[in-house]
């Protein structure tokens, strides 16, 4: 039985990506799993809900998605995985919501997600990894 693994990637944080590479490779090799990589572009309302400012002169969402997909595909090349077992996805919205939606849609057998050590912001707002652990219907491996 081939498993499906979802790997959310923050394309703006290469350190987090480095942390998950060996874990993803090891899990994928167990039974030739299909690995879906997902990056999420936070929507403007999501930024506003966090009280963050944003520029009124943002590029078009299609341009942002194309650039994000290009960056994600470059990151995927760092993983030692067969190209025919890998797929890249880009979504827009709340990262935790989109990760959970994709995990359910695939359906994923496992989510492998990198996380920072908690800080005050994490305690106030919660982390994406914590939300995924609480609400995912599949196994979740959090890598710190």
From Swiss-Prot:
Superkingdom per UniProt: Bacteria
InterPro entries (UniProt xref): Rossmann-like_a/b/a_fold, Universal_stress_UspA, UspA
Family, as annotated: Belongs to the universal stress protein A family.
Subunit structure: Homodimer.
Record Pfam families: Usp
Designated name of the protein: Universal stress protein F
